[in-house]
Amino acid sequence: MNEMTHRTKTRPVKVGNLTIGGNNELIIQSMTTTKTHDVEATVAEIKRLEEAGCQVVRVAVPDERAANAIADIKKQINIPLVADIHFDYRLALKAIEGGIDKVRINPGNIGRRHKVEAVVNAAKERGIPIRIGVNAGSLERHILEKYGYPTADGMVESALHHIKILEDLDFHDIIVSMKASDVNLAIEAYEKAARAFDYPLHLGITESGTLFAGTVKSAAGLGAILSKGIGNTLRISLSADPVEEVKVARELLKSFGLASNAATLISCPTCGRIEIDLISIANEVEEYISTLQVPIKVAVLGCAVNGPGEAREADIGIAGARGEGLLFRKGQVVRKVPEEIMVEELKKEIDVIAAEMAAEREKEKETQEQ
């Protein structure tokens, strides 16, 4: 974890068995695409998200059927579950009763004070945090009239207004998001929010687009925010399989040294010197390491002359040549392997190193607990 780009003065907030904020690592979130009342389909999608590395998952709760399904879903998953609530406070109460781990609301659209108070009291009783979801596309009318259009200042004002509603009810387990589809607006809003309050910030670029365009847009916006040390949890919003959201989020955090539980692939861009099918090999290796929960660095390079030197930081790697490959660790050649088995040999080495890393991590954990 890179302390230089990590926001350490944020208030810690418990979400299930995790803590968001404080000096904890950023948490990856996603949201299901299923109808929440379809428990079987929702659980199946959540399990795929878990396997991909999702740490917190949100479900839409638009009606009573969805709210009533929360308890059954909770029994079958292993990561914290968040209920996305709009307008009807009774759905929030049912979700809390069903064992939800966090509620996402806008206090301003829940209704009169007694309704907000009912949700807050139920959340407080169960130790459940509330995320205030500010969105540039749904700011309050009086804020739009004041500023003329969605602005970062208007978004922060909206957040502070909602925060005050909860604080007036002596509720402080709050997480805030400041989402916008405009990248520059989102960056400015998160910067100003980070200065305005110390509650954990949930990062996201809303309505970012399809898999390709949305990945680029989210990486541009969230990368700029992360580089400033802002953010405690994030979701990459894509019009795609939500598993892809998790994959992009993991890669983004790895790029900033903010994920200590994910494998990294280093591969060269290819050129006319390459004698192997590097692209397909790189894709195969990337898929193989995608679910590893250790910070192993793996290199797949096409040039046996420059390859090992270009990936000195890799724990293990291969550099291809005609008919054979060089297997190397930390830039030092270990042995030559025939081309037809070099990927399998690389996978064996990956398994060995990953097991060593996992054992070392468990040993450190046991030492800390003593």
From Swiss-Prot:
Catalytic activity: (2E)-4-hydroxy-3-methylbut-2-enyl diphosphate + oxidized [flavodoxin] + H2O + 2 H(+) = 2-C-methyl-D-erythritol 2,4-cyclic diphosphate + reduced [flavodoxin]
GO biological process, one term: terpenoid biosynthetic process
Domain of life from the UniProt record: Bacteria
Residues the record lists as binding [4Fe-4S] cluster: C268, C271, C303, E310
UniProtKB keywords: 4Fe-4S, Iron, Iron-sulfur, Isoprene biosynthesis, Metal-binding, Oxidoreductase
Keyword Metal-binding included in the entry's annotation: yes
Cofactor-binding details, from the entry: Binds 1 [4Fe-4S] cluster.
Alphabetized Pfam families for the sequence: GcpE (PF04551)
Pathway(s) this gene product operates in, as recorded in its UniProt entry: Isoprenoid biosynthesis; isopentenyl diphosphate biosynthesis via DXP pathway; isopentenyl diphosphate from 1-deoxy-D-xylulose 5-phosphate: step 5/6
Similarity comment text for this entry: Belongs to the IspG family.
PANTHER family reported in the protein's UniProt record: 4-HYDROXY-3-METHYLBUT-2-EN-1-YL DIPHOSPHATE SYNTHASE, 4-HYDROXY-3-METHYLBUT-2-EN-1-YL DIPHOSPHATE SYNTHASE (FERREDOXIN), CHLOROPLASTIC
Function in brief: Converts 2C-methyl-D-erythritol 2,4-cyclodiphosphate (ME-2,4cPP) into 1-hydroxy-2-methyl-2-(E)-butenyl 4-diphosphate.
Protein name: 4-hydroxy-3-methylbut-2-en-1-yl diphosphate synthase (flavodoxin)
Lineage of source species: Bacteria, Bacillati, Bacillota, Bacilli, Bacillales
